């Protein structure tokens, strides 16, 4: 049974809540191929949104995946759906703010794939809260710890593992088109940090044959963004694309970036903004 008609219908109903008169939904995604055949990838925040879409695109491309998330129930559900493809899929509960746990969890991940070399890390886990002037210190710490600090230290663990074992793999960081704008929220500030971290990792690891890049989506139809904008359709009205970007589109690019097709792309941030990058200060309000 083809699930696309049902998915499209639900998405249209969801988007209609934002008073949009017409949105064309295109869910074209990577078809089954062998671009990543036999490889092993860790994808943080892989239970929904962009993370899940990347995991699905990877398994369609022959990759074995380890997805992480904070909820065991959501992990089990995602693993169950991904397991219909002929690859290995494993889920691990991981809190991106608990840096002290990274070493042990990574060892357990290696055991789960019987010591096969893990050669792809996708840093996708992220959270968001309201921006200035309503951000609390607790929210600020949560965003920076999850989005930036966690990515930094997980990349450190994974990078050392690849260097020590002579693995010529990939690190792909999910940044954001918001990092093109002045930061007035902890989320945007964290994504500015991801930009810098991506460049630094790329420079440090290139000599070891490890390719590091970033992918920076614009407003994407993920549970996090749709929830945050449930009473505000500004994104759809102002974005030149005219609608939210679909996670599957971001996932398609992720496959290219970690495959041999993307080998010449190194230390780059690929922006998939839906036109957000050409908006002016007048298009995006800044105020308290």
Model region roles, listed by residue range:
Residues 27-31, 266-288:
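Short C-terminal tail/terminal secondary-structure segment
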Residues 40, 47-49:
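Conserved glycine-rich cofactor-binding loop
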Residues 131-144, 235:
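Substrate-binding pocket helix/loop in short-chain dehydrogenase/reductase
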Residues 155, 190, 198:
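Active-site helix of classical SDR
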Residues 176:
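Residue(s) in the substrate-gating loop at a strand-loop-helix junction
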Residues 206, 211, 265-267:
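Short, small/polar-rich loop/turn modules that mediate ligand/substrate recognition or access, typified
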Residues 243-272, 277-278:
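C-terminal substrate-recognition "lid" of short-chain dehydrogenase/reductases
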């Amino acid at each position: 049974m083809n699930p696309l008609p049902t998915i499209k219908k639900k998405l249209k109903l969801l988007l209609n809540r934002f008073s949009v008169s017409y949105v064309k939904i295109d869910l074209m995604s990577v078809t089954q191929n062998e671009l990543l055949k036999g490889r092993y990838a860790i994808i943080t925040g892989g239970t929904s949104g962009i993370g899940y879409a990347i995991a699905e695109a990877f398994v369609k491309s022959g990759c074995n995946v380890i997805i992480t998330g904070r909820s065991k129930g959501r992990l089990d559900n995602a693993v169950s759906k991904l397991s219909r493809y002929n690859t290995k899929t494993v889920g691990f509960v991981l809190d991106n703010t608990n840096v002290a746990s990274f070493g042990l969890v990574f060892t357990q991940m290696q055991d789960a794939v019987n010591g096969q070399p893990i050669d792809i890390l996708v840093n996708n886990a992220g959270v968001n809260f309201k921006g200035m002037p309503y951000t609390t210190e607790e929210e600020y710490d949560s965003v920076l710890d999850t989005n930036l600090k966690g990515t930094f230290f997980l990349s450190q663990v994974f990078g050392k593992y690849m260097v020590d074992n002579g693995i010529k793999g990939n690190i792909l960081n999910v940044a954001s088109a918001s990092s093109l704008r002045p930061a007035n929220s902890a989320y945007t500030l964290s994504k500015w940090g991801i930009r810098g971290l991506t460049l630094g990792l790329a420079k440090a690891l290139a000599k070891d044959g490890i390719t590091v890049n970033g992918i920076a989506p614009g407003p994407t139809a993920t549970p996090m963004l749709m929830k945050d904008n449930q009473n505000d359709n500004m994104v759809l009205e102002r974005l030149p694309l005219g609608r939210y970007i679909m996670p599957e589109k971001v996932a398609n690019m992720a496959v290219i970036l970690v495959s041999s097709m993307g080998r010449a792309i190194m230390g780059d941030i690929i922006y998939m903004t839906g036109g957000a990058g050409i908006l002016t200060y007048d298009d995006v309000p800044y105020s308290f």
